[in-house]
């Protein structure tokens, strides 16, 4: 009987030891998982960040670049802000978020509203521009400028959807349909010769940049990567127009 008690006690100790070892391994796994998730960022967190937020390269690498290039429906809160002369149904618009490099070589969150038919294409184009470190100074939504195109061009804001007419007309712009992008507009202005011989330059502060024979930074021409990417995806460039020139403008 005494020997039997000893055997039972030894068996019990062995079971306790195995259970302890098993729990320790489970604890290690939980610890490893906790450490892994601590270095990544939830996509929902990214979409709540304001456009213009600086993103450290190490964080982008840890998260994975694809998390920063997204397409989503227009949210209720955003639609409430946007409602101003809209001619496109909300269901036909998309909210895209991307990364871009500014002129000081810093990585920022950017965003724009566009038509759903070009949303995935724009995300692809901006991802290629980002990988190439193509400089885009600013990319925020036009309602921050009261949808004033002159104001956002002077601020060199890159944008797509903006509910407005073509300046000087009652014709709705391609931007009002979310089918055109203006890229680094201050350095790539619109201009045309008036009947009196004077020039109409937009933005008005861009007169140093309408002469495309000059060399300067951020100029879009036929050798520019943005031109090549946009046109390869079926966009037309305003710099190729005949009666006027719109070097910032790509449309579908």
Feature map (PLM): residue ranges:
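Gram-negative bacterial Sec-dependent N-terminal signal peptides
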Residues: 10-12
């Amino acid at each position: 009987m005494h020997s039997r008690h000893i055997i039972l006690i030894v068996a019990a100790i062995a079971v306790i030891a195995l259970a302890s070892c098993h729990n320790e391994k489970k604890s290690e796994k939980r610890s490893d998982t906790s450490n892994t998730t601590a270095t990544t960022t939830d996509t929902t967190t990214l979409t709540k960040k304001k456009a213009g937020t600086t993103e450290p390269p190490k964080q982008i690498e840890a998260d994975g670049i694809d998390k920063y290039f997204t397409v989503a429906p227009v949210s209720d809160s955003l639609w409430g802000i946007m409602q101003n002369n809209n001619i496109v149904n909300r269901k036909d618009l998309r909210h895209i978020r991307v990364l871009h490099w500014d002129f000081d070589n810093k990585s920022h969150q950017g965003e724009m509203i566009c038509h759903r038919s070009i949303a995935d294409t724009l995300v692809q184009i901006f991802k290629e521009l980002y990988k190439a470190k193509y400089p885009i100074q600013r990319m925020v939504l036009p309602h921050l400028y009261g949808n004033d195109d002159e104001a956002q061009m002077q601020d060199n804001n890159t944008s797509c959807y903006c509910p407005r007419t073509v300046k000087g007309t009652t014709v709705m712009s391609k931007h009002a349909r979310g089918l055109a992008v203006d890229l680094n507009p201050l350095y790539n202005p619109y201009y045309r010769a008036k009947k009196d011989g004077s020039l109409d330059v937009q933005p008005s502060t861009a007169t140093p940049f309408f002469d495309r024979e000059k060399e300067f930074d951020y100029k879009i021409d036929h050798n520019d990567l943005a031109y090549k990417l946009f046109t390869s995806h079926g966009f037309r460039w305003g710099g190729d127009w005949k009666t006027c020139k719109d070097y910032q403008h790509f449309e579908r």
